[in-house]
């Protein structure tokens, strides 16, 4: 059982907080979805763009992690046709009528299936979004509920995408951890698991997100501000803007829009990378906003360390003592499930 699966079993969510609003039949913004708190100013910013095919740009990865905690990658090896197919299948999924989608609704103690994002439990107001979580064999089980006789194409596309993300995440984590001084021997756990046991490989899951057209986007929130609990997140955001990050220079006072770049993917550093780098890599606060004219979809792939692997700061020395204690991912996920964006502070030395 993966750390993420165990987390959901140990921290079940009230079923009333799982099923999203039927957005198709909602013409005005209900009070349950009105976020009245004034939001900080949003601007555009020079988010780093790094080509993975250019060795001269690999040195920019660490700088991007330290200064931004988020960056675009191009020439990543994931074909445009696969990204297009993923986009089409997400829209196919989320365009289903509500009575069909709830056939695959996740149970209160389950980590996969259809429903609202888990972080909604930390807010009084609801978010203008819906999601579909995928992990392992759950994909075909839930897809069969949605399309009893026509699920093969959806499953094949998502399985191909998960495999591409597995390969890309291994490559990225190796490069990023290498920039902190780790050797190939240190990163033995990054070798892709060929046995199917999952004991010598990263843990991962895929979150498909839908942000429907909103009647009053200035008062709504697609995805509330948060950091990710992973090592890193690889995000496909299509060609419609919506992702915003907290300004590294003006935290809490300004948001920066991450404009889509055709064919690129966005990498967001997670809390575990912040811990491993002893605070050098930023775990960036980010959110998703909605709009009045376009239905936006995104696919977020979360990568974490193997189950029961202890991690801790790797770059500490006598001049820079460790600021976080060692932990396993399951332990951190449990803290995040209770303390949300304050979880990092619990692991300080």
Swiss-Prot record:
Instruction: Give, as in the UniProt entry, the pathway in which the protein acts.
Output: Plant hormone biosynthesis; gibberellin biosynthesis
The molecular function terms of the Gene Ontology recorded here are:
gibberellin 3-beta-dioxygenase activity; metal ion binding
Q: Does the keyword Oxidoreductase apply?
A: yes
Residue intervals of the Fe2OG dioxygenase domain: 201-305
Give the EC number(s) listed in the UniProt record: 1.14.11.15
Residue ranges of the TM segments = none
Q: Name one Pfam family in it.
A: DIOX_N
Q: In which tissues is it expressed?
A: Expressed in flower clusters and siliques.
Similarity section: Belongs to the iron/ascorbate-dependent oxidoreductase family. GA3OX subfamily.
| Role this protein plays | Converts the inactive gibberellin (GA) precursors GA9 and GA20 in the bioactives gibberellins GA4 and GA1. Involved in the production of bioactive GA for reproductive development.
What is the protein's name according to its record? Gibberellin 3-beta-dioxygenase 3
Q: State the encoding gene.
A: GA3OX3
């Amino acid at each position: 059982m993966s750390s993420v699966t165990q987390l959901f079993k140990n921290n079940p969510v009230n079923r009333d907080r799982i099923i999203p609003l039927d957005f198709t039949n909602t013409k005005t913004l209900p009070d349950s979805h009105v976020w009245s708190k004034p939001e900080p100013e949003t601007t555009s910013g020079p988010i780093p763009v790094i080509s993975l095919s250019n060795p001269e740009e690999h040195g920019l990865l660490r700088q991007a992690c330290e200064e931004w905690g988020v960056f675009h990658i191009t020439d990543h090896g994931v074909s445009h046709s696969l990204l297009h197919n993923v986009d089409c299948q997400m829209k196919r999924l989320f365009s289903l009528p509500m009575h069909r989608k709830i056939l695959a609704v996740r149970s209160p103690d389950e980590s996969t299936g259809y429903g609202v994002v888990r972080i909604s439990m930390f807010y009084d107001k609801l978010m203008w979004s819906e999601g579909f979580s995928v992990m392992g064999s759950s994909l075909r089980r839930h897809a069969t509920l949605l399309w009893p006789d026509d699920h093969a194409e959806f499953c094949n596309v998502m399985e191909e995408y998960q495999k591409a993300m597995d390969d890309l995440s291994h490559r990225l984590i190796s490069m990023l951890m290498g920039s902190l001084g780790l050797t190939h021997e240190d990163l033995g756990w990054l070798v892709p698991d060929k046995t199917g046991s999952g004991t010598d490989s990263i843990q991962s899951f895929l979150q498909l997100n839908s942000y429907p057209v909103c009647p009053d986007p200035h008062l709504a929130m697609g995805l509330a501000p948060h950091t990710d609990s992973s090592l890193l997140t690889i995000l496909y955001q299509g060609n419609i803007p919506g992702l915003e990050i907290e300004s590294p220079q003006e935290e809490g006072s300004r948001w920066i829009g991450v404009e889509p770049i055709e064919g690129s993917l966005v990498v967001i550093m997670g809390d575990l990378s912040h811990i491993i780098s002893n605070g050098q890599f930023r775990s960036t606060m980010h959110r998703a906003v909605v709009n009045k004219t376009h239905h936006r979809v995104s696919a977020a792939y979360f990568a974490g360390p193997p189950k029961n692997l202890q991690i801790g700061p790797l770059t500490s020395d006598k001049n820079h003592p460790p600021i976080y204690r060692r932990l396993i991912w399951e332990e951190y996920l449990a803290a995040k499930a209770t303390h949300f964006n304050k979880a990092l502070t619990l692991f300080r030395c």
